[in-house]
Structure formats: C-alpha cells, structure tokens
Regions:
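ATP/NTP phosphate-donor binding region
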Residues: 2, 7-80, 316, 321-323
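Catalytic core of DAGKc-family lipid kinases
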Residues: 50, 59, 98-210, 214
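Short Gly/Thr/Asp-enriched flexible loops that form oxyanion-binding sites at enzyme active sites
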Residues: 87-101
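Gly/Ser/Thr-rich active-site loops/lids in small-molecule metabolic enzymes
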Residues: 171-179, 228-248
Length: 323
C-alpha cells in the first residue's frame, strides 16, 4: 500500500489486534539515478505478499531520514527499511538508535558505494535485497556512538577520511575503490599530518597521523579488507591508525590494503577496542559512515548488539557461529 503512513489511532489498534506486521520504507529519491522509484511498486507488493502492511516516505533533504525514522519508532513499526546509500542508512540509524523501542532494520542499497550493505552481504540488486527482507533473518549487531551521534559502519578522522566526500559520485560509480586510491595519491602531497592522542582500552598512542578509523565492519570506502578481523556483533571496534607517511608509504599501504595485509605494516596500528578516546591538537573533521559528523575530539563507544538488521539466512548462520 503506497501511502504517507498517517494511520489513525484506530488503524494502529486494529492492526495490533490482528497481529499484522507493519513496514516503513524510508528512501532517498535521488540515490542511484532515481532507480528505486521505478521499482517501488514491486517492492511494496513483495512486502505486502510477505504479510507487511507497508508505507513509504521519500526524503526531502539532509536530516529528513532521521526525522522519518523517529516517527516510525513512535508509531511502532515492526520494520524500518532504509533505501539509499550509506548516508541514508546512517540517518535512519540515528533516528532509531537512541529510542527504547527499536524496530528491525532492513537495507535496500541504491547508493554509490554501499559499504554497509556489502559488509552484511546485501546485494545491489533491488529484487535480491527484497528477497532478504522477506526470506532472510534478523540478527543483532553492534552500533557505535560518538558525541551524541551514531554510526553503523565506520567513523574516522584525518584529512584522508574526507576522500568519501571529495571523490565525485560519478567517479565512484565507474571506478569503485580505485577512485579513492587515485584521489588519495592526488591529495597526499598537500596533506599535513595531525598530532593526536588516542586512548583505547587502557593503551595510549601519541604522535602524528594521516588518519584513524573506528570500524564496525570490514567494508570501508570500497575496500573490503580494510578491517579484516572485524565482527559485527562482538562488542568491539577495529581501530586502525595510519601514522605519518610519504607518498611511497601510502602507495605501498594502499596496495597491501587490497589484500588485507596492511595491518602488518610498521606505519599502521591495528587493534580491537570497546571504547576509544581521541584528542587532537589541530582542527580535525569527524567522518561518520562517509558523511561529515562535526569536529573532533570524540569518545567512541561500542553499543553491543544494539539493533537488529535483516541479512540472508547464510550470513545469519555465519554470524551466530562467530558470536
């Protein structure tokens, strides 16, 4: 059913009495060259055939997906589906994460890089993503919180993390992770390292860095092995610190990162941590799930199995085996 989700109190009571499941799709109408809008009737039909009373909301600008998710929580939807890129998913998560009642989360990846969807094994095909929503399984996963904001995939700081919004969307679509690699080489000569203090689970790093990453998954900026030991539901972040480097160092480390071998490089610190505190001596932007998240400093806290997300049955079985 295509509507704006404005149920009356009577509708909500009747639906609950009938035991009907309710799904709310929050979608970015501009993502993926507006491809999702063309498939929306099919998606609604699939969900309704699976027993969901379904409605949708098209976002109108920055922050709107967060507002829409908060409304969906208030109206006690069983499932909230984020259809868009990593930015849309991040906004939806920020609307759900701080609430006492948290609906299950579904993902339809129609953005450019779709890092989080790749990490949980949700394919780019809209039909295949719908298969997971109606035939898959929901599993609890960790979330990250920093400075009263939430992230589901990655947080970081340092000029190199700004690659995610420096690289044009068209170039990301055509070249994938190579676009980040090339942009990094272009930017590096003009980048000055930043002096930081990073505390992580009783340890302390002090020195100049090019970037730091706080990862919840293994998929970052199109690189699927940047945090190779990452687990979504273990209550731990993967912390990656790239020390001061020159161009030759960067090219070597980026090449190793394609194979997940960068974590052994002497210019890289890689560790597991539940809580990470970062202090900076200079101005440093905070990047949350590929979007601008304000300025550092910040304290990153892992929220253990804080939200349930739909994945394929195979992926769910693997995650349960690891936990």
């Amino acid at each position: 059913m295509l509507n704006d989700g404005m149920e009356t109190p009577r509708d909500i009571i009747i639906n609950r009495m009938m035991g009907m499941k309710r799904a709310r799709i929050i979608y970015n109408p501009t993502s993926g060259r507006e491809a999702f809008k063309k498939h929306l009737p099919e998606v609604l039909q699939r969900l309704e055939q699976a027993g969901y009373e379904t409605s949708c909301h098209a976002t109108t600008g920055e922050g709107d997906a967060t507002k829409a998710a908060k409304i969906a929580v208030k109206r006690r939807y069983n499932l909230v589906i984020a259809a868009g890129g990593d930015g849309t998913i991040n906004e939806v998560v920020n609307g759900i994460a701080e609430q006492q009642y948290r609906p299950k989360l579904g993902i339809i990846p129609v953005g450019t890089t779709n890092d989080f969807a790749r990490a949980i094994g949700v394919p780019r095909s809209i039909n295949a993503a719908c298969d997971i929503l109606v035939e898959g399984e929901s599993v609890p996963i960790d979330l990250g919180r920093v400075n009263k904001q939430y992230f589901i995939n990655i947080a970081g700081g340092g000029r190199l993390t700004e690659l995610t919004y420096e690289v044009p969307s068209k170039l990301k679509t055509i070249l994938g992770q190579l676009a980040y690699y090339l942009k990094g080489i272009e930017m590096l000569p003009s980048i000055r390292p930043t002096e930081v203090e990073i505390e992580y689970d009783g340890k302390l790093f002090e020195g100049e860095i090019m970037l730091f990453l706080v990862a919840n998954t293994n998929s970052v900026g199109g690189f699927e092995k940047l945090a190779p030991k990452s687990t979504l539901n273990d209550g731990m972040f993967d912390l990656l610190i790239l020390k001061k480097t020159n161009l030759a160092d960067f090219i070597r480390i980026a090449t190793y990162a394609l194979r997940g071998e960068h974590i052994r490089d002497p210019k890289v610190i890689y560790a597991k941590a539940n809580r990470i505190k970062v202090q900076t001596h200079d101005k440093m932007q905070l990047n949350l799930d590929g979007e601008y998240g304000g300025l550092m400093p910040g304290e990153f806290v892992n929220l253990y199995q804080h939200i349930e997300v739909f994945v394929s049955k195979d992926k769910a079985a693997k995650m349960k085996k690891k936990s």
